[in-house]
Amino acid sequence: MNNLEIFEESKKYMPGGVNSPVRCFKEMGMNPPVIKSGKGVIIRDEDGKEYIDFVLAWGPLLLGHCDEDVVKAIKETSENALAFGAPTKLELELSKFMCENLDNVEMIRMVNSGTEATMSAVKLARGYTGKSKIVKFAGCYHGHFDGFLIEAGSGVLTEGIPGSLGVPKESVENTLIGLYNDKVQIKELFKKYGNEIAAVIIEPVAGNMGVIKANEDFIKELRDLCDEYGALLIFDEVMTGFRVAFKGAQTLFDIKPDLITYAKIMGGGLPCGAYAGKKEIMEKLSPCGGVYQAGTMSGNPIVMAAGLATLTKLKNNTEFYDNVEKMGKKLQDGLIKISEENNLPLIVNRVGGMLTLFFTELEKVNTYEDVKTCDNERFKRYFKHMLNEGFNIAPSQFEAMFLSVKHTEEHIDKFLDAFKRFAINEK
């Protein structure tokens, strides 16, 4: 069966033919390639076409596809363990590794996804503070938990949906919407609701309205407000953890969060998530405290092995991050140069190995309102052009591109050559 045949048959058994909406390429007006295999930065579809991958499973594969050490760990572990639903040495080893090597992580709880991590962190914050309201920011995506699906960015923003059907108003009445990088608005929000706010959750580097780094004075304001009103500050590092730096986006700010959520890279390509923070807070979780959260597959031994292999390799090879930064800068500089030479309105935001192309006339993109000015029709033309040229990029103006340690100057040069042809065609 070829790509089209597989995808058409998939529609008979899965809504839209996919298990996550953005994969269907609906907004791009085309069918997606059906991926068969991947190694390094190269993926192959069922038609045999190869692509240089800048999606990397939506971020987890910093080491590239099927890294030999990660695959070895999975194979060796699977000979003796699939799942137990019981304590294992592997979950101790990964938990200890993260507590000893990350900032502001005294205790950790393993879960199975980023959504589980963020929803559980919010529940814990509510249980710890005894308060109900949370603040999230327009354009930030924290998973498909009901209380987060307001102004959520990601696929919700791509499809122009304000939220989601099936979410009753009661589920979101305790969710307050902040404006990213707007100190005045967040002060007013706390002035009105501060004594009811349990937590503020934020992507310190947003990745689901495109890549936007929070201003340092804005993050400091959040910390100060949380301290003043007795709320917890939660950093959602599902995307940025181990990516923008080994210790995550925390290293970009001189600010300590109370709780941090992780996923993606920490699972080495397998389903994984975690939330972590101060011992005093984490011990409110059952069985120590009264905040109940559980999971049959949490701490799964194969996932723990993949995660430990991934994070150990990243820690022991710090030059990986230098190379990703070098490739990211080369790509960013090249895109800007080509756009200027061809009078193509473009802003390229980048933090480490994640970046976004914003097709806009603005001089900078720093807020959710800025993002909404982007030319989505031009993005669609860009997307189709690059896919045809053999590059796998996210089918959304509002998602990040990701680099891995396996991307080379040759890969970047090929991407820039293809982008130049697009820019010339846009004249």
Curated annotation (Swiss-Prot):
Q: What class of enzyme is it?
A: isomerase
Q: Which GO terms describe its molecular function?
A: glutamate-1-semialdehyde 2,1-aminomutase activity; pyridoxal phosphate binding; transaminase activity
The protein's superkingdom reads Bacteria
Q: Cross-referenced SUPFAM superfamilies, in alphabetical order?
A: PLP-dependent transferases
Provide the positions where the record notes the PTM N6-(pyridoxal phosphate)lysine. Answer: K264
| Record-given protein name | Glutamate-1-semialdehyde 2,1-aminomutase
User: For this protein, what is the EC number?
Assistant: 5.4.3.8
Gene name?
Answer: hemL
